[in-house]
Amino acid sequence: MGIGGSDMYRQQILDHYKNPRNYGEIEDATFTHVGENQSCGDTIKMDVVLDDEETIEAVAFRGDGCAISQASASMLSERLPGTSIEELREMDRDDITDMLGVEISPMRVKCAVLAEKVAQDGAEIYLGERDLDTTQTEGDDPDIPE
């Protein structure tokens, strides 16, 4: 009996959670930013290296939390290299859902988008468009991409 599409994606999420890609840090990152989901305790710190044209060259992350938040960070760290900083800023919740391959329950959306939000906020801070110490995904956050 074959694995259904949804089961395959669930296995992929578990694989990224148990064997995260690009886990660690980049000492000479262009920017580093940290975020947390206070409602469940997920944390992600992300390092991003940009080239001279502001295209993402490398991403590393470290953190702690549920399978969805950590798998999302791992998958995003593989997806972002080769992406422009503008393309990163345009990503939204649907991009993360598509990347994960499963529907995310309303209670887990903040877990799923934490890494994306950390990367986007880090980019905005780098560009001088935002002054923020830590990304938060607590409460009704209007900045969580729809």
Task: Specify the residue positions occupied by each region the protein language model found.
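C-terminal binding/interaction regions
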Residues: M1-E27, T32-H33, E57, T83-E146
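Basic, gly/Ser/Thr/Pro-rich low-complexity segments located predominantly at protein N termini
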Residues: A29, M46, I68-Q70, E87
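Short beta-strand elements
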Residues: D42-D52
